[in-house]
Amino acid sequence: MQLPRNPFKAALDGDTRYGCWAGFATGYAAEILATTGFDWLLIDGEHAPNIVPTTLAQLQALAAYPCAPVVRTVNHDPALIKQLLDIGTQTLMIPMVDTAEQAAQLVAATRYPPHGFRGVGGGLTRATRWGAVEDYMAQAHEELCLIVQVESRSGVDNAEAIAATPGVDAIFVGPFDLSTETGHIGDPTHPEVQAMIRHTLDATHAAGKAAGILAPAEADARRYAQWGFDFIAVGIDISLLRQAAMETVSRYKG
């Protein structure tokens, strides 16, 4: 059996890809989103109540659809990274990366020795299709896409070095954490924050890597697309449900 291709990684050098945050932590909700036309979904393990089994259920639900899953971890824990890779995650997003040294350690956590220190699960893992994928350990890195998040002043200052780290495929900017750290809470459109976002984008592209960002507001998303961001999350499932519910109720209750 051949190693499954990673459609998210394959599409990074094409047109802007639009995605949605998936926070309900169920395969049922993720599968509904997969039918709507989004190019990718972020299965959020940082702020949503996801654990390894719920992430697995969502990966399985999305497998039948042309909607690529991206899995975000809660932290930099190599043991968790190993588990997420073993259940078949091919595109992994890691939050709060501030230095190239951190980025290099994360790359190593996704690679087998001698190029890293990922543990060997063999036939126990969905990633190998329980041993059916030939030469999995030798080629797994080819379809792995590692995205690191820059969402602090330190990360922005080190964006060039982070982006240049071998094995890092993309940088994802966290505009809301950036705006909070700089004292512009809830205002990622503040000129200071916008300048930091633009700097990170330029540094990422200068290194030949892809850049992504979260932009639930349409005006922001369109501006970032014009700037050249390669992948943009334009919605959050929980927010979309709440907004639709509020609009429905308001039509009847005023």
Swiss-Prot record:
Keyword entries, A-Z: Lyase, Metal-binding, Pyruvate
Enzyme nomenclature, EC number: 4.1.2.-
Catalysed reaction equations from the record: D-glyceraldehyde + pyruvate = 2-dehydro-3-deoxy-L-galactonate
Single GO MF descriptor: metal ion binding
SUPFAM superfamilies cross-referenced by the UniProt entry: Phosphoenolpyruvate/pyruvate domain
Enzyme class: lyase
Keyword Phosphoprotein: no
Site (Increases basicity of active site His): 86
GO cellular component: cytoplasm
Family: Belongs to the HpcH/HpaI aldolase family.
Protein name per UniProt: Hydroxypyruvate/pyruvate aldolase
Active site, per annotation: 47 (proton acceptor)
Pfam families (UniProt xref): HpcH_HpaI
Cofactor(s) required, per the database record: a divalent metal cation
InterPro entries, sorted: Aldolase/citrate-lyase_domain, HpcH-HpaI_aldolase, Pyrv/PenolPyrv_kinase-like_dom, Pyrv_kinase-like_dom_sf
Record-listed a divalent metal cation binding positions: 151, 177
Site (Transition state stabilizer): 72
Keyword hit for Cytoplasm: no
Function: Aldolase which can catalyze in vitro the aldolisation reaction between hydroxypyruvate (HPA) or pyruvate (PA) and D-glyceraldehyde (D-GA). The condensation of pyruvate and D-glyceraldehyde produces 2-dehydro-3-deoxy-L-galactonate as the major product. Has weak activity with hydroxypyruvate and D-glyceraldehyde.
